[in-house]
UniProtKB/Swiss-Prot annotation:
Its EC number is 7.1.1.-. This is NADH-quinone oxidoreductase subunit B. It is an enzyme of class 7 (translocase). Belongs to the complex I 20 kDa subunit family. Disulfide bonds: none annotated.
Amino acid sequence: MEERRPGMGVIVPAGEAGRTTVEGYDPKLHDPYFDGVSQRLADKGFVTAAADDLITWARTGSLMWMTFGLACCAVEMMQASMPRYDLERYGFAPRASPRQSDVMIVAGTLVNKMAPALRKVYDQMPEPRYVISMGSCANGGGYYYFSYSTVRGCDRVVPVDVYVPGCPPTAEALVYGVLQLQKKIRRTGTIVR
């Protein structure tokens, strides 16, 4: 069997047949024209970046959240906004309207009667939109799991991006969840093609 050397062509999966790539090659990083232009602009004090990278960077630093506080987890969410933890220093500011927010924090027990309202508010949010499920009740029903009226996790109603465990989770856990969401946005981007 032939050993692989750097620079050998690698066959792309059948869905993209006919194209080959070279290991370690990234067109953004290795385009000679882009490198030349980038170097000339850097000498003049400018920074070059792809537009989608710039938009993703800006979006992670200006996430607007709205609360869907249903129970005691909302108290910890309020504490995370106070001066000790101050979520706004991460660019995570509260908004009252779903039409102005990017992130919904579902905190507390979601019951069957409230599920349609949650979905309606989620549908009013502009794209791209993200959901943080905060606490055991929002994650999977929690203490009220066996109740006839409890939805066993808000992910049955809306798609969830980050789960914050705990009963109730601490403000530090929510801050960590926000940082994880920002990492996810940086990793996946926001532009759909």
